[in-house]
């Protein structure tokens, strides 16, 4: 069966313009306009998705099948083009019968054209085929538009679902444009409203605990690099290519109706020299219905500017991924559990903003892993937030899992973060020795987020930095009073 892409090629129908018009109509829809006004950071993320939309639409048009009736009519038209005028006259009754049987839009016009002329001349033969082709072009264009409209509705539905999800999570997870872009990419998964409301809930809890958010910001950016620009920078010539519309079109892009004499198709010019069709030619010229070539072009010019040469001395400090271990023992339940989950959500926010990875491991008797910054980060975050802290404490297994993870090349500059009340047994000597080796030889940093003031000093001594967030009632009341 004939594909739509083949039909467009045969009839010189350009689908590019229709795809662009559909994309522009989608971007101008009221839903997207309101969304962009409310969440300006996500506008760039959605705009960056446009090439993927275009490719999906082109693929849909390329793979679409032409209806059997239209396929049969196109094949008949192609065969008719090969016939001479006497041969065409012999085949004309069968052609008219075929058009009538297929309910072709051209059937009535073809019948009228033959009945109104007693003699079927070569000029009439040319006109018959020309109008038949025009009818096929209209049918092909209509088919393209119908498919694009179906795709537009589906695409708009998908975009609205992603906009709803991204709009709900943007205040919690999108700190800058980079985070907004990654959040938009994550929203492509199949999620229901009830699922991501858990992230919204912990986002609201995090907003009510600004000290927790501030702690995550300090920990996440404690290794930020510093750059010092040099003074008296010399000027350098900078050349760029600037695209400008060409004054002289240079490429055939299809066929259109118009009155441009210089771009007429040869069959149209042929009718001008036939006495019987001369008035028909002028009528179509006045009504701008003559078939003409559609041309376009572009030009590039070199723009020369000068700018200072900027050299910077950078104090290189790695800002690698987070490996976060969360204690899920019974002593970490209640308010501690809420704080631990909200703190991980805050680290996820920092990771998205700085284009870093955020890997979560839960430790009690077993180790459960989640990656919050991957393509399925939102689903992983929901699963993590759905966990209940009711196990025991095996902090040694947590450290062994961290050490094993840091052996991989992609984690060579990772920071380890352990969230616990640190009320546990002492660490084995081999674990302490291995952690010290990672700190000395590979510059890995180990952070402790202590949720209690009663953590064992023997355990916490191995950490590079201890971030304290006491969840006791007295500390909670003091924090609220200071606000």
Curated annotation (Swiss-Prot):
The name this protein goes by in its record: Regulatory protein ViaA
Protein's gene: viaA
Superkingdom assignment: Bacteria
Chief location category: cytoplasm
Keywords noted in UniProt: Chaperone, Cytoplasm
Family note: Belongs to the ViaA family.
Pfam families: VWA_CoxE
Function: Component of the RavA-ViaA chaperone complex, which may act on the membrane to optimize the function of some of the respiratory chains. ViaA stimulates the ATPase activity of RavA.
Binding partners and assembly: Homodimer. Interacts with RavA.
Alphabetized Gene3D superfamilies for the sequence: von Willebrand factor, type A domain (3.40.50.410)
InterPro entries xref list: Uncharacterised_CoxE (IPR008912), Uncharacterised_ViaA (IPR023481), VWF_A (IPR002035), vWFA_dom_sf (IPR036465)
Subcellular locations according to the entry: Cytoplasm
Gene Ontology CC terms: cytosol
């Amino acid at each position: 069966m004939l594909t739509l892409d083949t039909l467009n090629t045969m009839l010189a129908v350009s689908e590019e313009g229709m795809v662009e018009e559909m994309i522009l109509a989608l971007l101008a829809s009221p839903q997207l306009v309101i969304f962009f006004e409310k969440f300006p950071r996500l506008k760039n993320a959605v705009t960056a998705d446009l090439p993927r939309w275009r490719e999906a639409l082109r693929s849909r048009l390329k793979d679409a099948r032409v209806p059997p009736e239209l396929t049969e009519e196109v094949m008949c038209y192609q065969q008719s083009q090969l016939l001479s005028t006497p041969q065409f006259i012999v085949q004309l009754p069968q052609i008219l019968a075929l058009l009538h049987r297929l309910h072709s839009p051209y059937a009535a016009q073809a019948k009228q054209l033959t009945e109104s002329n007693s003699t079927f001349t070569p000029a009439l033969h040319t006109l018959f085929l020309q109008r038949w082709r025009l009818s096929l072009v209209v049918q092909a264009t209509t088919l393209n538009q119908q498919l694009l409209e179906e795709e537009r509705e589906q695409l708009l539905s998908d975009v609205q679902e992603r906009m709803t999800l991204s709009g709900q999570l943007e205040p919690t997870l999108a700190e800058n444009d980079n985070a907004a872009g990654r959040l938009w990419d994550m929203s492509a998964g199949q999620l229901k409203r009830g699922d991501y409301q858990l992230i919204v809930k912990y986002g609201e809890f995090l907003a009510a605990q600004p000290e927790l958010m501030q702690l995550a910001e300090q920990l996440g950016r404690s290794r930020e690099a510093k750059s010092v620009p040099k003074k008296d920078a010399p000027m350098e010539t900078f050349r760029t290519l600037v695209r400008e519309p060409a004054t002289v079109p240079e490429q055939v892009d299809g066929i259109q109706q118009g009155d441009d004499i210089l771009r007429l198709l040869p069959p149209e010019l042929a009718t001008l020299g036939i006495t019987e069709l001369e008035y028909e030619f002028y009528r179509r010229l006045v009504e701008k219905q003559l078939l003409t070539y559609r041309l376009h072009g572009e030009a590039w010019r070199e723009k020369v500017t000068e700018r200072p040469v900027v050299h910077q001395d950078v104090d290189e400090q790695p800002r690698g991924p987070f490996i976060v271990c969360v204690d899920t023992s019974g002593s970490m339940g209640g308010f501690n559990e809420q704080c631990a989950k909200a703190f991980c959500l805050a680290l996820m926010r920092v990771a998205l903003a700085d284009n870093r990875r955020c890997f979560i491991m839960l430790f009690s008797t077993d180790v459960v892993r989640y990656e919050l910054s991957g393509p399925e980060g939102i689903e992983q975050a929901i699963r993590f937030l759905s966990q209940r802290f009711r196990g025991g404490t095996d902090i040694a297994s947590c450290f062994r899992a961290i050490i094993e993870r840091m052996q991989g090349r992609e984690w060579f500059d990772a920071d380890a973060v352990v969230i616990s009340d640190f009320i546990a047994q002492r660490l084995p000597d081999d674990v302490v020795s291995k952690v010290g080796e990672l700190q000395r030889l590979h510059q890995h940093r180990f952070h402790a987020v202590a949720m209690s003031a009663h953590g064992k000093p023997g355990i916490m001594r191995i950490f590079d930095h201890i971030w304290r967030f006491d969840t006791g009632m007295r500390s909670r009341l003091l924090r609220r009073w200071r606000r």
